[in-house]
Amino acid sequence: MRHSQYLIPLIQRGYVWTLTEQIFPLWEDLIDRMDAIAAFKVDAEKVGGAEKLRALRKHFLGTVVVGSAKGGGADTIPTREVIDGQQRITTLQILLLAFRDVVKPLEDEGLDYSLKTLTRNLGKYRERGHHLKVWPTNVGRDVMQALSDAGSIEAVCDRFPVKGPKKARYERPLMVQAYLFLHALLAAQLRGVRYDDSSAEPLDELDELLNEALGEDGSAEPTIADQVIRSIEKDNVVVPPRAELPLQAERAHLLYETLRDGFQVMSLELDDEDDPQIIFETLNARGAPLLPSDLIRNFVFLQATRKREDVDALYDAHWKAFDEKPAENAKKEGERFWRKEARQGRLKSVRLDLLLYNYVSLRKCEDLKVAHVFEEFKGWWESSGKGTEFELARITSTAKHFETFLLPNQTSRLGLFCRRMQLLDTSTLTPVV
């Protein structure tokens, strides 16, 4: 990763890994390999050399597919587009950033420099973000920049609180949650405290009620990892467990050795003539299904990239709201308007999929199946002959009217009509109206 940047293109979805589903299992794998390497060292000393022992297996993290290097010069950095594996590569970068910040108090120049070269492109660059090793999609860039610049868990907590004035509640971005979790457990591990040790903290009333609602007896003692997750969800300041204990340099070096030698990632580099969109769709065909709106966004901005259009400007003007607009009456700050499920007659899908379903039906003057929206959109787009800016502007304009169908205000004739359509549970006229 020296002097290069992994660029997550707009054909990818944002960061979606969660603490319980992906980050915690990754941490378990890391500690498993760390324990194995520590035991291997002891055994090697007993038998008189590592060459007399069977080599340790490495933990396979998966495959990362990247494009060929583009650009690079005196004040620019060569970039590689990540076609598949962005969740893994982003998480590993967050892990390295957290590790970098944890070991600062040790003042170990060698370790500091090694982690610095893995988390930052050293030098002066004219483009924003070129010093970062991983540059996410537009939605995550400010977060990754903040994590890179913060330098401490305290600064990250201050930048991304969960509680605000007047009892306001915020949901920390998933990348921030990953950083806080990994930082806290890294710091604990370097103090000799394991993630599965008992936290010795009794459950509060809210957690007891939750256990009761889930039918759990609560007999299992909460662990250090449980304590950290609860703190990330509830506390403005996340304090690493047993923070009064000193950090141990030998543990830090063992952890670095584990990351360097105990994990394996397969990297595949595409040739210039390979089609990243086709490869991306093929690789994800059997994974977590992408929504039609995800595929449409990927297709549109890949086409714009090929035409050398200003993709960032197009995204900010015409698609950013689809990714970031807050939901009405949101229970949590992170809920998004266009990602909420909605029902329209016999159809049930996320709002953005329903919008695009109706939009394509309108443009093609045909009745479609919502499952075929992407294929229909792609065929219509390629035959329309209109420019990217023109068509995206029409979609965003249509979206404003579609919001009235979703949330009729009844203060206008259109709103009253949409309310009556909802009561009749009919959607036949939606594309026409």
Q: Which residues make up each language-model segment?
A:
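An acidic- and aromatic-residue-enriched active-site/binding cleft used to recognize and process polar
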Residues: I11, V66-A69, Q86-Q87, I94-L97, ...
